[in-house]
Swiss-Prot record:
GO terms for molecular function: nickel cation binding. UreD, UreF and UreG form a complex that acts as a GTP-hydrolysis-dependent molecular chaperone, activating the urease apoprotein by helping to assemble the nickel containing metallocenter of UreC. The UreE protein probably delivers the nickel. Required for maturation of urease via the functional incorporation of the urease nickel metallocenter. Keywords: Chaperone, Cytoplasm, Nickel insertion. The gene is ureD. The lineage of its organism: Bacteria, Pseudomonadati, Pseudomonadota, Gammaproteobacteria, Pseudomonadales. This is Urease accessory protein UreD. It comes from Stutzerimonas stutzeri (strain A1501) (Pseudomonas stutzeri). Coiled coil: none annotated.
Length: 277
């Protein structure tokens, strides 16, 4: 009999609340409150004062059963924040669920780039994620999410536990995107052609705006080692992919970001230095 345990025996209850305001031509972090092991490093301005970059860190290094992470981010009118992470978020095997609640609020004229590195869900983990994004007026969003199930390189398939995620995006209180996923360990969808088709990594990119046909085709023609595509919806671009490795997935998303950021946000893509460490 296998007992599901992990050395991180305390149940972490962590909260992080961030707020940004535009002052003149600069975006300034005006709220940074945390409790438990969730925090941000010093704010950075690699592109100048208009774009404030923060790296969200979770010092325990992983999320175990009973843990709860609550993250709330608010951008005031005209602010621009870019949020990323220093490495993969790891959800460990556990006998009880662990939770993450993410709330992102972007006021008119503001821009949020949510660009974390991948989420690795170990076999027998019970990961439950809920994300709510509120856009107001002409607020702009560039969001992605990468999920890796199991650890194939270590010979570990996702054969127990579950991954559950919900994503709601609203603009001016009107629902413009709703998605709900639940994948159980050893689920037939893991290998089904209408599911993950034997791949262990999947990702979604959602950006606000409209693309012209030429740029859409350029994005679709990017060389990559993933199976992916883009769709233009009213006011949203949605990209999805399946892959065997998170590294390939991340490379594809970054290539898309390099093409899309100038067109949608009016700035050339400057990759965060943390991605290269």
């Amino acid at each position: 009999m296998t007992v599901l345990t992990h050395p991180f025996t305390p149940h972490w209850q962590a909260e992080l609340e961030l707020g940004y305001t535009r002052i003149g031509d600069a975006t300034r972090p005006v709220l940074r409150r945390h409790s438990g092991p969730l925090r941000v490093q010093k704010h950075l301005y690699p592109e100048g004062s208009e774009v404030c970059q923060h790296i969200i860190v979770h010092p325990p290094g992983g999320i175990a059963g009973g843990d709860r992470l609550d993250i709330s981010v608010t951008l005031g009118p005209g602010a621009w924040a870019q949020l990323t992470s220093p490495g993969a978020a790891k959800w460990y095997r556990a006998a009880s669920p662990a939770f993450q609640d993410l709330q992102l609020r972007v006021e008119a004229g503001a821009t949020l780039e949510w660009l974390p590195q991948e989420t690795i869900v170990y076999s027998a983990a019970q990961a439950e994620l809920n994300t709510r994004i509120e856009l107001h007026g002409d607020a702009r969003l560039f969001y992605w999410d990468i999920v890796a199930l199991g650890r194939p390189a270590a010979g570990e398939r996702f054969d127990a536990g579950h991954f559950q995620a919900r994503l709601d995006i609203r603009r001016d209180d009107r629902l413009i995107w709703h998605e709900r996923q639940r994948i159980a360990g050893a689920d037939a969808l893991l290998d089904s052609p209408i599911g993950l088709d034997g791949r262990s990594v999947f990702a979604t990119l959602i950006a606000s705006g409209e693309l012209d046909a030429d740029l859409l085709e350029r994005c679709r023609g990017l060389p990559s080692r993933v199976r992916g595509d883009l769709t233009q919806l009213p006011g949203l671009i949605v990209a999805r992919c399946l892959a065997d490795e998170a590294l390939h997935t991340r490379a594809w998303l970054i290539d898309l970001w390099r093409l899309l950021r100038p067109a949608l946000l009016g700035r050339e893509a400057v990759p965060p230095r943390i991605w290269s460490t």
